[in-house]
Amino acid sequence: MSNDTMYFNSSRRLPTHSRNNSPIVAAKNNSSTRIPALNNKKPSKKTEKDIEQLLSPQQLPNGQRPDFGHGPRGGKQTNGAKTKNKKKQDKELQETKDSYDNLTKNLKNLLINPEKTEKTVVETLIKSNSNSATATPQKAPNTTQGITNSHGLSQNFSSPLSTPMILPHNLPMNPLGNPNFPANNHYLPYNPQQLQQQQQQQNRLPVGPGPMNFDNFRPGIAPVAPPQPPPGYPPGPNGPPPGMPQQLNFNGQPMYYNQPPMPVPNSAFPINQSIGASPTLPRIIPPNPMNYINPALSTPPVVKNPTSNGPVTNTKPTNKSKRNSGRKSNTFAGASFATDVPNESNLPKPSFT
């Protein structure tokens, strides 16, 4: 049998041990007394080194050993460990619930009793926001600073971080900021006598031209006229309601509805004040820009057709009809007909370019 036939048929033969391997197999299967020389053979240092390299413990980049879920770290926990973890979780949940309950209680008390002092409110908030339930409240730092304004009066301004957002009870409710009227002027009832007195005071203003007195003039402050009711509201000293938007003139002063702007005395020329003080002139109500509709934009232009009886709407051709009417194709599959003059754009392009 040739070598080729032996190698070709080697896969079909039954696996049998060769003669050279039979003593080693017998030595492994039998006792060590049969061949004592094989048992006394020691492994080389190279083999031990290779085994140590293969069995080196695995380590993650963060220095921890990998946990595949079947090791001692990821195995089943004992009953004692489970009980300990459950108690710890229950304690954390109870502390969180107590802190939320305390915070809700403090907020309710703050809304019911707004007369609480700043110190008490800050202490309760700090105590509720602390991590541990037994944390001692810290005293709020005093951030109040005294600032002296240009009139020589000292005012106390406190930091918004340590003060609650509570409006004082004596805050003036005048939305226009006019010092000539009481603070809560929009709560007063309608008084026709007071309105008549105000109109008489307006009529007493000088009508004719004349020099103005600049002794008590302050630069940057324009004379403020009493508020006039907007259209649709009954006349009264209340002025526009507090929810109406307030417009400002070029000097930064509030500008009332239906009231012409008062000029600022910035020159020595006489100023005629009869426009705003004359009771005989009718009041001009400005038109509402929301109700104004341009008729030219609302309806399309109409052209009279002499041949027909009714008007015809002037319509423009659409883009599709314009494209179809302006383009006539004289070519078919890239080639022009014999009756037309061939153009360079209509000729077929070669494929090798």
Swiss-Prot record:
Residue stretches of biased makeup (Polar residues): 1-34, 305-318, 342-353
Record's keyword annotation contains Transmembrane: no
Predominant location: cytoplasm
GO molecular function: RNA binding
Domain of life: Eukaryota
A GO CC annotation given for this chain: cytoplasm
Keywords, alphabetical: Cytoplasm, mRNA processing, Nonsense-mediated mRNA decay, RNA-binding
Annotated spans, Disordered: 1-100, 129-156, 169-189, 218-253, 296-353
Localization of this protein: Cytoplasm
Pfam families: PNRC
Protein biosynthesis listed as a keyword: no
Family statement drawn from the similarity comment of this UniProt entry: Belongs to the EDC family.
Function: mRNA-binding protein which stimulates mRNA decapping.
Protein name: Enhancer of mRNA-decapping protein 1
Organism: Candida glabrata (strain ATCC 2001 / BCRC 20586 / JCM 3761 / NBRC 0622 / NRRL Y-65 / CBS 138)
